[in-house]
Amino acid sequence: MFVTFEGIEGAGKSTAIDYLSDYLQARGHDPVLTREPGGSALGRRLRALLLDVRTGGLASRAELFLFLADRAQHVTEVIRPALEAGQVVLCDRFTDSTLAYQGYGRGLDTEYLRSLNTAATGGLEPDLTLLLDLPVRCGLERAGERNRSAGMVIAEGRFDSESLDFHERVRRGYRALAEEEPERFAIIDASQPPEDVVLQCRSAIEAYLRRRGRGLD
């Protein structure tokens, strides 16, 4: 099972993934936790470039192809082998981030982006996508506090420094994507306390499995 986690900055995706990993391990699974950018050795180098605020003047298409290079390597090196081995993969961001950020946020054509995503992934799509949704100002406040606490304001703050309008477009983009594919997406109210967010995510995964006559145990 391939589960992706999407949302604006500060939505709490990493926290939810960590809790769900513990939940799955308690039920005998060995989940693979990964992220974009940065899920492979190459990806970690690309992440440092893409998220650093000192990476100035990066053209939208240049940014796009760096993310796609990360994804192509990530799928080949990490995601597809894990799925073929029967493991559950929990991924912090995937193809929908490209549509939301480079499409709705940067204004690149979404159909063009879909075709590039397909090329980068070899057609691999998530089984379930959990969209952690919350107001933009709340998310940015959380992201800023997180990066300050970790000393990562410079190293990982490039997207946090985008305009409020940019992040509003990204959020609207995510919600539009969820409306287009309601069977794949579950919208999670990420403005709630972390424990409530995790419960929503867990319920969404269990509901997905019930629809397919499967269980976690």
From Swiss-Prot:
The keyword Isomerase does not apply. GO terms for molecular function: ATP binding; dTMP kinase activity. It catalyses: dTMP + ATP = dTDP + ADP. Pfam families: Thymidylate_kin (PF02223). PROSITE patterns: THYMIDYLATE_KINASE. GO terms for cellular component: cytosol. One of its GO terms (biological process) is dTTP biosynthetic process. It is an enzyme of class 2 (transferase). ATP binds at residues 7-14. The keyword Zinc does not apply. It comes from the Bacteria. Keywords: ATP-binding, Kinase, Nucleotide biosynthesis, Nucleotide-binding, Transferase. Its EC number is 2.7.4.9. Belongs to the thymidylate kinase family. HAMAP family: Thymidylate_kinase. Phosphorylation of dTMP to form dTDP in both de novo and salvage pathways of dTTP synthesis. This is Thymidylate kinase. The lineage of its organism: Bacteria, Pseudomonadati, Thermodesulfobacteriota, Desulfovibrionia, Desulfovibrionales.
